[in-house]
Amino acid sequence: MGLTVAPFAAWFLAWIALAPLWIFVVSSKRKNYPPSSLLLLGLTWGIGYHGVALFWITGIHPMDWLGVPWWPSLAITIFCWSFISFYGGLFGAIWAACLTHISEQKSWLRILIGTAMWCVLESLWSAGPLWWSSLAYTQSPHNLAILHLGQISGPNLVTAAIVSVNGIVAEAWLNRKQGLLGRYLAIATGLLITLHLIGFGLYTAPIAKSSDTALKVGIVQGNIPNKIKLLPQGLSRAITGYTDGYLTLVNQGVEAVLTPEGALPFFQRNLPTTPLVSAVREKGVVAWIGAFGDRGRSYTNSLFTVNSQGEITSRYDKSKLVPLGEYIPFEGIIGGLVQRLSPLDEHQVHGSPNQIFDTPFGRAIVGICYESAFPEVFRSQAAAGGQFILSSSNDAHYSAAMPFQHHAQDIMRAIETDRWSARATNTGYSAFVDPHGRTLWISGYNTYETHAETIYRRQTQNLYVRWGDWFTPLLVGLSFLGWSLNIFWRNDANANSKLR
């Protein structure tokens, strides 16, 4: 499963990669294997998936830009990668343990409950601080048709589609001796085609464009390496690069300019004196600037709206911080084992949930870096009236696979919310994406670039934006109903056999 995402992008394997685990767990339970071996199967599968998919985190080594020596840097990197791989492995172990308890149920009920359990676990994991590798993102950016199921009930519906097809394929193998292999494979194929046809129907829906909703946005990709970002030459390069980029885009007729996360590593109180804000006052074109917000003795990672008069009129604070990077989860337990990777000495804090970000062009949906992995951050802002997406990221810490996976996450958020998206990063990949997930333009990697594109403000409210993930509770309810009916039928059959 880990090969389905960048840099391998074998997305089609996702439709069969879970089936072997399903088969091994069910067949091993029937052979009375010890429970520990079944848990180990799930743990191994989970570590394999998340470990391969998130191998890009090893790109943080060497951390000489933080002054960390080579060997300690390697130790920290190995710990971080091992920790997130094991954390993902726990997901697989829990799911495998649940599957063992229904291994004696009928195939249709096993598929229903197995799919529901996976969706519930993804909901729980995504509600926590450490999340990235939903099964749904294995299909992005290549399988745009199936990703449109996200407009109905979010990424969990895409995940349910993948798990259910894998389950039917697995049950085909488990029931092959009963001569049911062909029947199950036909059902799996039919379901796969039907789901893609539904998604394709949504994918081909026309996108309304009008001059009244058009907004020409420019992005500046500063390409400031982390090694120099906070050094004098890095600060000078950032100030010059973003100011010159802003002026270049203004000359191209943009109405607003978006910069990456932490583009100017200054606090809000110092922003008005920067050359970039001075240029905004002079040219009268709005800028969205990534910088740091003040919050008492702490700070936030923020995006600011600077209006045509050079005034800061709105602020969005990053609410999902990077574990082991921007803060230490379970700090009381592991805080002494891992040094903080953030280059700043002050204590970074989470932004509040349910923020709104008003701009001179209407309300926007904002995601800063790691937040792209959390669909609810975007859905809630769309439900609150957000009309377009502004994604601001750094992505300079890791290997090239990470920013491409990050772009894939932003594509999913654009599809789910039915919004146009402008994405500005420090080193790549910056991009513009339409509501169908089509990339209109994408930058190079480790390059300085500016680009302008016209996006459109939208106020549509699809099922997912309006109701959130309603499918997972429905799936759980159907599973409970199926379980209850199965018990009733079994008891009824036993009673009838006694009467005879």
From Swiss-Prot:
Cellular compartments annotated: Cell inner membrane
GO biological process: lipoprotein biosynthetic process
Record-level Gene Ontology MF annotations: N-acyltransferase activity
InterPro entries per the UniProt record, alphabetical: Apolipo_AcylTrfase, C-N_Hydrolase, C-N_Hydrolase_sf, LNT_N
Residues spanning the membrane: 5-25, 38-58, 74-94, 111-131, 145-165, 185-205, 469-489
Cell inner membrane recorded as keyword: yes
Pfam families: CN_hydrolase, LNT_N
Similarity comment text for this entry: Belongs to the CN hydrolase family. Apolipoprotein N-acyltransferase subfamily.
Name used for this protein in its record: Apolipoprotein N-acyltransferase
